[in-house]
Each structure stands twice: as structure tokens, then as C-alpha cells.
Amino acid sequence: MNIHLDKHGQGMPLVLFHGWGFDSQIWQPIIPYLKPKYQIILVDLPGFGLTPMMDWESFKKNLFDQLPDKFALAGWSMGGLYATRLAIEEPARVQYLINITSSPRFISDIDWPGVAEEVFVNFYNNLSKDINKTLKEFISLQLNKMKFDFKIGNPPSPEGLAFGLEILGTWDFREQLKQISIPTVYLFGRLDPITPAKTMAIMEKNYPNFKYVLFNRAAHMPFLSHTDLFITMMDEFIK
């Protein structure tokens, strides 16, 4: 059981984790912008793309066997949960942590402005019916109807979608996040319907040592909707 990696360029290793329902192909449009400065390492998470299902410990061991000793790590949406857990458990390997429209807890509760679990359940049901149509509509909504030609290479497995749904509903790193001392940044989109921008105010209070960036006109995919701003932020953060 091998994790599928796709590498581009030379330089500081930058590992990218995709979000739920997608695979590493979602990063393809920004590779030309990152490749001159970084060695980009795209990862298909378990049950997505070309990576088979596996549990967390198998994923971590398999991944670390294929990665450099130290690297910067960026996770988008659900991928941010994977990235955060990796940084909490293996801080000696992760030099920088970048969370893109992600948070330590996705589901809302009485004192946390996440999203209702029904949103993910509905998305899951739509994905199960017509994955390409659902993903294209999702991207169109997040990019405010901006044209983006996304071709999904390998549809996620039903097990991958279900496991991802469980992760989004149950993983909660709000307490463990206080242990993180590596440089960490959280990126939010003011128009994001999935990771509400008001999460940022709570996080700034609870985790004052982290950096926070708000994309005023972005929704859930600022790396595609505002690529130039996103690349500038990455270059300023990763020294």
C-alpha cells in the first residue's frame, strides 16, 4: 500500500494536502507559480486519487518514508486537519504549517463557529450521485463563477468519502493546537461558507502566536481565486 506522490521543481520541500472530495490534481494550476522556489510534493490522501484506504498510522509511516527529513506543510480544508495532526505529532519534521481555509474543528458547536454537519452530508450524497458535476459546481461557487477547467483524474472511493466525512465530523485539535511552536499561519476567505471567517477572531484570541491572513474577496479556495496574493503570502511566510 503506497501513498501516491507527485513531485515538481527544486528547492525548499513544500508538501500539499488536498481537501475532501478532491485529489492532488486540484493544485495543478498553481504549480508553475511555486515550482521556481520550492520542491512541490503533491499527496493523494487515503481513499482519494491514487492512494488506497489506510489508517492514520499507516498513512504517517508510509508518507514519512517518502518525504525529506524536514519540509513545509500546507493543507487545504480537510487537508488542514491532516496537516495539523502531523505537525502536532511530528514537530521535528514539519518546519512550517500552513492551513488554508481550515480550522482545528470543522463542525460548529455552542462556542465554535464551524459549519453544520448536514452541509457535509448533503455534499456527500451529491458526490455519490454525480461526482464530476458536484465538484465542478462546488468550484464554480467558490470561485464566484470564474472559469476553471478542473478534470478529476481518479474519483474518490466511497470508503474515502465516508472516512473523510468522519474526519470532518470528529477530528478536533483545539486543545492540542496549543502545543504547536513551529511557524503557523491560518488563511481565511471572508466569503467562505464552509470555514467561516469569524473563526479567525476566536483563533487570534486562543492562539496569539500564529499568523492570520484574511482574503477579503475569497471564499473556500483562495489559492485558485486569488493565486497571486496566495503565492505572495507563501513566499513571505516560508523563509
UniProtKB/Swiss-Prot annotation:
The active site is at residues 77, 192, 220. The keyword Metal-binding does not apply. Coiled coil: none annotated. Its EC number is 3.1.1.85. Substrate binds at residues 20, 77-78, 138-142, 220. One of its GO terms (biological process) is biotin biosynthetic process. It comes from the Bacteria. GO terms for molecular function: pimelyl-[acyl-carrier protein] methyl ester esterase activity. Pathway: Cofactor biosynthesis; biotin biosynthesis. Pfam families: Abhydrolase_1. It is found in: Cytoplasm. Gene3D superfamilies: alpha/beta hydrolase. One of its GO terms (cellular component) is membrane. It catalyses: 6-carboxyhexanoyl-[ACP] methyl ester + H2O = 6-carboxyhexanoyl-[ACP] + methanol + H(+). SUPFAM superfamilies: alpha/beta-Hydrolases. The physiological role of BioH is to remove the methyl group introduced by BioC when the pimeloyl moiety is complete. It allows to synthesize pimeloyl-ACP via the fatty acid synthetic pathway through the hydrolysis of the ester bonds of pimeloyl-ACP esters. Monomer. Belongs to the AB hydrolase superfamily. Carboxylesterase BioH family. This is Pimeloyl-[acyl-carrier protein] methyl ester esterase. It comes from Legionella pneumophila (strain Lens). The lineage of its organism: Bacteria, Pseudomonadati, Pseudomonadota, Gammaproteobacteria, Legionellales. The gene is bioH.
